[in-house]
Structure formats: structure tokens, C-alpha cells
Amino acid sequence: CYARLKEYDTYNDEPLVLFDEKESNFNFTLVTATNRVVNTGDLYFTPVKGNDPNSVIMRLNTGEGSHLDFTYTLKPDDYMVQYQILGTGLNGVLAPSTNALDLLWEQDIRQQEKGRKFEDRYVTLNYKFMADDVEHLSESKSDSKQIPNRLKWIGYKDMFFSTVLISQEGFEATTLDSKAIPEGDVLKQFKTTT
């Protein structure tokens, strides 16, 4: 996983990278039909050629005629990556009670601007309820919140840029964590579980 904004640089003229594979984790937990718990981050997905030149399909083959596809689509001149999960022939592979996937999303928010203290005041974990206003965890200290209500989106924001996960159906039973890091290149560590 790697997200770089090509039109922008950090205060010291380095490429502006929102996150890379060392600073982020995006993982789903699956329960198999034999009650094994597996994490998608531990599995091997292979790229599959699709019809859309703006899309990448990563496929987890689970047996003859069955697979799990993660499709990433980035339209030209857009920053919004469309992400779709599609399972084919997974009856007998996943537990019959599977009706949703448990998500773990972690990201370190690195310092991008020259003034660490000033920038740190703007680094927040924001979230929006399906039919309500935007809320956020504390900007100044470590914070955690369990939210039973459905969320429309969750955003990890630094001073000027955000990484946002949006759901059409909403996220349920979400736990949000923000850990303040007092020194070094990382300002905060954000974590979301659903």
C-alpha cells in the first residue's frame, strides 16, 4: 500500500507520501467454513487483467471456480480510489454466517510540515454518522471511542490532506483509536476496527 501526491512535496522538498506499506495496514478478517480465522493481509492475492484500464483487480483464489476480488479504480485526474469487494463461488469456503467483513485499518500520520507542534494541532481522526454531523477524536491527546451507530465515513487527516474510507452501507460497531506520538517523524497513530 502506497499513496503519494505527485503535485505536492513536504516542507523539505521530499515527495509527499500519505502512507506506505511500513506505516499502514488495511486488512479484513475472514472466517472459513471450517471455522479458521484468516486475515487478508496474510494471504496472497494475484493481479488479474480486467476490462477497465483505470482498474487493478487483486484476486485471492480459494479453489476451483471460487475467488475473492479486490478491485481498485482510479479515474484520470481524480484522487478518489473506488474500492469494490466481490466474492464468487464462496459458499462452502466462508462460514455460512458471514454477512459482513471485519475491518482493521491502521495508519501512522507522518510529519509533512516544518512546524511539528503547529501541524500536530490539525492531525485528527474524523468520522461522520450516516444521518448526522462530522465528529472527531481529540486533537491534543490520545483518544478512543466505541461507536455502536452506523458511520458513513472515517477520515485520517493531517494538516492539509486526508485519507478517507467511505461506505455506501455504512460501518457498524466501530472502534476508533488515536494515539499521540510526542516526538519523531510520526505525529499520531490512527486505528479503526469494525
Model segments located where?
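Soluble non-transmembrane domains of integral membrane proteins
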Residues: 1-194
